[in-house]
Amino acid sequence: MAKNEKICIIGAGPAGLSAAVHLEKNGYTDYSILEKEDHVGGKCHSPYHDGKRFEMGAIMGCPTYYAVHELELFGGVDHNGPKLERAYRKMNGKPYDPFNPKKNPLLIPHLLKMKSQVKKLGTLLATKYKGYQYTGHKGISEGKYDGYDPVTGKHVVGENPNLKDLCMNFKDFCKLNKVELAQEIWIGPYTAFGYGFFDEIPAAYVLKYLDFATAMYFVNKDLWTWKDGTQSIYEAVNEKLQHPARLNVNITKVTRENGKVQVYIGDKMEEYDKIIVTAPLQYLPSYFDATEQEKALFAKIDYERYDVTAITCKKGTYYPDMSGYLFDNMVPERLGHLMVFYHRWKDEPNQVLTTYVLRNYKGKELKTYEEAKKMAWDDMKLCGIDIDKCVYERKWYYFPHVFEKDYADGWYEKVESMQGQLNTYYAGEIMSFGDMEETVQYSKDLVARFF
């Protein structure tokens, strides 16, 4: 592709900014990043309260975040944030330690069995499911792997018929492999972080995000945070780009005619040679001249209704010294209840705590935002936390994905076969996963493959 091509990138979240960085590294200089919000970073969103930043979206990373680290180096930032500690609570708010055999001697047989199954899963992933961890989903439903290896920095292609098992939901996948207890480890950084319930989400999503090494870093609390929030990574990257993102851009229409791409911003038209879409593909047909294939495929996308509130505690009342995980609430039967509250700044009771809830599950009625918010705050009260006020809240369009049948029917292979048609390229969360490492990796690989 000619290096002087004019390229439009829709979205200035991790995916869009990663695409821009790697276009620059590949010698492209004529690109524009168009962002509808008034800030960059997407769901890496770190507002200020009382002089410090807190997290409303992405919170942490770990040493397997290779692509994010590359962006850190580009922007000149480091993971220099507060160390994260966590405790566990029952649904009644009372503290307990489900993983400590000294405090729970009756649980020793269960814990030993769980440890054995986790080890078994690690072995299976490295052998039976070789190739499971590479970026993107192309080939999985056909028993192949075709993605980016962040460890070597190379695109890897191969065959492994066992990978078809990743099309089934994670609960069934664990049952098939007789490692059901491993779910007790994976659920904390998965369901609590808003990515859905194990009996409805294809195993490929779970394991591409929480590959074995990443899962173990979460277990051992070998985690990265950022003093100025995850948003600061992308602010720094944006400042270093030759063409920083244009903010508050309202794209009204996109057409693809005469071998070019026409992007309408209000009543003005800008013409490009290529377009990379990192904004939600589910909504692409509402403003693109979408093909019938685009309409049909993108209509199959669903997403999680994941809500976050940032609250302060009443002065002089109990302020926890670490985050709290409520495993009992991470099941469909407790939909809408508090799954985790996040504590960021030690010994600073004037700082916020953030609450996290899921409102949707297949076959169950969607909880309303206000209904789930009340449930979460009532759960906070059970934890001994007396809420003063809400300083920030957000309803996220979160973790776009497809379900088992569409995954197995080759949804990803069909979308990947469309890459480059009508000078259009698809990236963002749906093409990989909803965490920042996978989205950043996918954009890097997309640029390497096509630009």
Question: What are the roles of these predicted feature ranges?
Answer:
Residues 5-32:
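N-terminal Rossmann-like FAD-binding beta1-loop-alpha1 element of flavoenzymes
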Residues 15, 39, 282:
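Conserved Rossmann-like nucleotide-cofactor binding loop
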Residues 24-48:
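Glycine-rich FAD pyrophosphate-binding loop
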Residues 26, 250-366:
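Mid-domain catalytic core of redox enzymes
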Residues 43, 51-82:
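Conserved FAD-binding subdomain of flavin-dependent enzymes
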Residues 78-200:
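Mobile amphipathic helical/loop "lid" adjacent to a hydrophobic cofactor/ligand pocket
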Residues 210-265:
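Helical element adjacent to the flavin cofactor pocket in flavoenzyme catalytic cores
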Residues 342-451:
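Conserved flavin/dinucleotide-binding core of flavoenzymes
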